[in-house]
A protein has these predicted regions:
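Gly/Ser/Thr-rich phosphate-binding loop
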Residues: 99, 111-179
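Catalytic cores of nucleotide-enabled group-transfer and carboxylate-activating enzymes in metabolic
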Residues: 168, 178-181, 185-191, 196-199, ...
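Conserved adenylation A10 loop of the ANL superfamily
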Residues: 12-28
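Conserved ATP-binding/catalytic segment of the ANL
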Residues: 201-239
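Conserved pre-ATP/AMP-binding loop-to-beta segment of ANL
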Residues: 2-17, 47-53
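Short beta-strand-to-turn element immediately C-terminal to the catalytic PLP-Schiff-base lysine
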Residues: 29-31, 161-165, 196
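Charged, glycine/proline-rich intrinsically disordered loops and linkers
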Residues: 1-2, 167-184, 225-232
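AMP-binding/adenylate-forming
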Residues: 26-49, 53-111, 149
Length: 239
């Protein structure tokens, strides 16, 4: 298990590195106050408790690995295991746990294993993110019994920020139809948002800076439901 000084992180803050999926990788410092706000959202959104058992297979230097479930689990005193992702052993390992965070690449790798179609993911919570999660992946994991939460966040905010929780196939098909197959951001929002020229702006205590952050992500809203339309050429900050 990777050794992480969670106590020091909570007391002193932490610098995380962006994955580079939205541009040049950069370092973002998260203050103790910001981490407290992010923890509160992550715990509420994913229904994490002291009895949860979290299996982390993503890097601790990234927001997805550290902030989505690992730091919240430590804060709650929940069971936590950190290990490298192995698609051939993951499904067996995950049987002893309740929550995990997977990228779409992880999810695709699991779907392509021999044992996936016979797996029982009932009672398992799978947070998906870092890249947009396509509908086929959401459907296949829910079909196996999992609760799936495709989530939008960034190294600068959240990372649990905008999402939807899926736990039955009718719901998956309905949302997919409403969004006409476009990637989903979600309809549960944990910060202030506005859309300017189709670009998503975010603001709130889970953001590393004050004022509005121009995300560089293009979105479309259907009522309170948001879909992802792609990236602008660059990501700028605005107060």
């Amino acid at each position: 298990m990777e050794v992480v000084d969670f106590k020091s992180i909570l007391s002193n803050g932490v610098t995380i590195t962006s994955s580079g999926t939205t541009g040049t990788p950069k370092e973002i410092f998260r203050t103790p106050e910001n981490l407290k706000a992010c923890n509160a959202v992550a715990i509420d959104a994913q229904k994490l408790t002291s009895k949860s058992r979290v299996l982390t297979v993503t890097r601790m230097t990234h927001a997805g690995g550290l902030l989505t479930q690992s730091l919240p689990a430590y804060t709650l005193g929940a069971e936590l295991k950190i290990q490298q992702f192995n698609p051939y052993t993951f499904l067996k390992d995950f049987q002893s746990y309740t929550h995990t965070f997977l990228t779409p690449a992880h999810m695709k790798a699991l779907v392509n294993t021999k044992g996936f179609k016979d797996s029982n993911l009932a009672g398992k919570f799978v947070l998906g993110g870092s890249d947009p999660v396509d509908w086929d992946l959401i459907y296949k994991f829910v079909y196996q019994g999992a609760t799936v939460m495709p989530n939008w966040g960034m190294s600068e905010i959240g990372p649990i920020t905008i999402n939807t929780t899926f736990n039955d196939l009718v719901q998956v098909l309905h949302y997919r139809h409403v969004l006409k197959g476009e990637f989903i951001l979600g309809d549960c929002v944990y910060c202030d948002i506005k859309i300017v020229d189709n670009e998503l702006y975010v603001r709130g205590s889970i953001c590393y800076q004050e004022g509005w952050l121009a995300t560089g992500d293009l979105v479309e809203s259907i009522g309170k439901l948001f879909s992802y339309k792609g990236r602008k050429n660059s990501c700028n900050h605005s107060n």
